[in-house]
From Swiss-Prot:
Function, in words: Pre-60S-associated cytoplasmic factor involved in the cytoplasmic maturation of the 60S subunit.
UniProt GO MF annotations: nucleic acid binding; preribosome binding; zinc ion binding
PTM entry text: Phosphorylated by MELK. The phosphorylation may redirect the protein to the nucleus.
Zinc finger U1-type: from-to: 4-28, 69-93
Biological processes, Gene Ontology terms: intrinsic apoptotic signaling pathway in response to oxidative stress; positive regulation of apoptotic process; positive regulation of JNK cascade; ribosomal large subunit biogenesis
Primary location class: cytoplasm
Subunit and interaction comment: Homo- and heterodimer. Associates with pre-60S ribosomal particles. Interacts with MELK and MYBL2. Interacts with DNAJC21.
Record-linked InterPro entries: Matrin/U1-like-C_Znf_C2H2, ZN622/Rei1/Reh1_Znf-C2H2, Znf622/Rei1/Reh1, Znf_C2H2_sf, Znf_C2H2_type
Originating organism: Mus musculus
Basic and acidic residues biased stretches: 167-177
Annotated protein name in UniProt: Cytoplasmic 60S subunit biogenesis factor ZNF622
Family, similarity comment: Belongs to the REI1 family.
SMART domains given in the database record: ZnF_C2H2, ZnF_U1
Keywords: Acetylation, Cytoplasm, Metal-binding, Nucleus, Phosphoprotein, Repeat, Ribosome biogenesis, Ubl conjugation, Zinc, Zinc-finger
Gene this protein is translated from: Znf622
């Protein structure tokens, strides 16, 4: 019987060197742990099998770290599959997945509504196919944040991913859509002014010059006409009638992908869902033209309705719509000279004191230019064309001549669409800019003035008492 043994591992050795080397091995340490746990020792072959199995598990974990898992619904990247499984069971992922399903369902319903308008019924549609389409739309939905997007190492993969998301490639040297749209509007305005100037010049020439007209044959007249000019005019007219590429139709929402069956329903949707309102709607004369212009501004120019040229540039309609929804910019900017942008769609003649209902605008302009100022000899007051009264300075020593501005504001006859929208605004509690709103504004101005005076008074009073570190610069 050998004298050198290991009781823990139940093995014998020929010499002391092998015994000391055995005590330093992992096999002996493993059996020591098993002995402490009151478990039987394992043989050398069994220990090697367990080591190989543990190495396989470690290699699989390393491989899973290299192949990261990505959640499309949440836009998150996970290093291990276990973390990905834990994320799938979280409440946050379930909420985002439900939102994605609802968004995809709304998109499918919108497409179905458009198909119904085109005459394509939904009969015979397979429900399984619809569900598969919804799941495919969820998987194809892009990430909401560029920081959460999966990493793409090569340019080819980047171009493929951009094409899959539907984002067109953009040339860095290309001008932003906003700048291009502003240039187009400037060209249209210059062209319109030039045409108006030509028409005025032709009218003046016809009035000043008396030319002798000669009778010519019909064949000669046809020979003088240039067919190329007529073709060019027809092309220009067709270009003006057709909407620009990318413009939002008047039946689609300016701030989301909602589609309505009519213009009035579209405006009602934008009012209720996005709190969009049209300023001075009682004087609006062309609702369709205004919504069409705003659709071109958002769809073609990619411009925020509130930021205008001051905000950052956008390169897609979805981006500018998301910006307006996130920043609560679903409103028109009409402060100062910005209101002149929408002047063509309004008619404020009904607010003029000398306006008569049913009067021709041309006659009104002629009367306004030839109008004579009225003067009252008894009160020595001068009545201006705007209705304002001006007193004489010789009477200033007796009393202060302060005349109000009487304005009889009447609501002009407008289109049926504008009337319906106005009724919707009033049903939502809109009161306009008169009455209690003006009184409240004046009260707030008075409160602000009193607060400013009080703050100035307190500041002046504490200016002399709160100088804790003041030191006189005389008599050192």
């Amino acid at each position: 019987m050998a004298a050198l043994t290991c009781i823990t591992c139940r093995v014998a050795f020929r010499d002391a060197e092998l015994q000391r080397a055995h005590y330093k091995t992992d096999w002996h340490r493993y059996n020591l742990r098993r002995k402490v746990a009151a478990m039987a020792p394992v043989t050398a072959e069994g220990f090697q099998e367990r080591v190989r199995a543990q190495r396989a598990v470690a290699e699989a974990a390393e491989a899973s770290k290299g192949a990261a898992t990505y959640c499309t619904a949440c836009g998150k990247k996970f290093a291990t599959f276990n973390a990905y499984e834990n994320h799938l069971g979280s409440r946050r992922h379930a909420e985002l997945e439900r939102k994605a399903v609802r968004a995809a369902s709304r998109r499918v319903e919108l497409l179905n509504a458009k198909n119904l308008e085109k005459g394509l019924g939904a009969d015979g549609v397979d429900k399984d196919a619809v569900n598969a389409a919804i799941q495919q739309a969820i998987k194809a939905q892009p990430s909401t944040s560029p920081k959460k997007a999966p990493f793409v190492p090569t340019d080819e993969c980047g171009r493929a991913a951009a094409g899959a998301r539907g984002v067109p490639e953009r040339d860095p040297t290309e001008k932003p859509p906003r700048l291009q749209w502003f240039e187009q509007q400037a060209k249209k305005l210059a062209k319109q002014q030039w045409e108006d100037g030509e028409e005025e010049g032709e009218e003046e020439e016809e009035d000043d010059e008396d030319e002798d007209w000669e009778d010519i044959d019909s064949d000669d007249g046809l020979e003088c006409e240039d067919p190329g000019v007529e073709d060019q005019d027809a092309e220009d007219a067709a270009a003006e009638e057709s909407p620009p590429l990318g413009a939002i139709p008047i039946t689609d929402c300016l701030f989301c992908s909602h589609h309505s069956s009519s213009l009035v329903k579209n405006v009602a949707h934008m009012t209720k869902v996005h709190s969009f309102f049209i300023p001075d709607i009682e004087y609006l004369s062309d609702l369709k033209g205004l919504i069409k212009y705003l659709g071109e501004k958002v769809g073609v120019g990619k411009i925020c309705l509130w930021c205008n040229e001051k905000g950052k540039s956008f390169y897609s309609t979805e981006a500018v719509q998301a910006h307006m929804n996130d920043k609560s910019h679903c409103k028109l900017f009409t402060d100062g000279d910005a209101a002149l942008e929408f002047a063509d769609f309004y008619d404020f003649r009904s607010s003029y004191p000398d306006y008569k209902e049913g009067q021709d605008p041309a006659e009104l302009e002629a009367l306004s230019t030839d109008k004579i100022l009225e003067c009252d000899d008894e009160t020595m007051e001068l009545i201006l064309p705007s209705g304002a009264r001006v007193g004489h300075r010789s009477l200033m020593r007796y009393y202060k001549q302060r005349f109000g501005l009487p304005r009889a504001v009447t609501v002009a006859r407008n289109q049926k669409a504008v009337g319906r929208v106005l009724q919707q605004y009033r049903a939502l509690g809109w009161m306009g800019s008169t009455g209690a709103a003006l009184m409240r504004e004046r009260d707030m101005q008075y409160v602000q003035r009193m607060k400013s005076k009080w703050m100035l008074k307190i500041g002046m009073k504490n200016n002399a008492t709160k100088q804790m570190h003041f030191r006189a610069q005389v008599r050192f």
